[in-house]
Amino acid sequence: MPVIMQSQLERYVDEIKKIYGNHLKAVILYGSYSRGDFRADSDVDIMILVDLTDMELKRYRHQLSEMTYDFNEEYDLDVKPIAKSNEHFQKWVSAYPFYKNVKKEGVLLYGAA
């Protein structure tokens, strides 16, 4: 991953911390950037794991969307975050192919997954 991208991802994680605070458990980069086969037009796939219920997560949806939009505009990126309950992710990681893939190829940017 290019050094400039690493710096931008660190800033994005800092913004995620501001939104979720102590509820944030992990931020995982997955997809083409984690595998190293990205192109100039690749999106940046981010999994956010939090210590919140699905209902509680909904309260943060707009804030995450607004922050991500502003971040993408500022850095000319296409960050695509998915926020999930850490409990849900851990429960289903061995059963859901998508979660398995995130766990297998993911690069931990913050916390522990």
Labelled PLM ranges:
Residues 25-33:
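Short gly/ser-rich loop at a beta-strand->alpha-helix junction or flexible surface loop bordering the NTP-binding
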Residues 45-49:
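Short beta-strand->loop micro-motif that forms the acidic, two-metal-ion catalytic signature
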Residues 1-23, 35-40, 51-113:
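Catalytic core of pol beta-like nucleotidyltransferases
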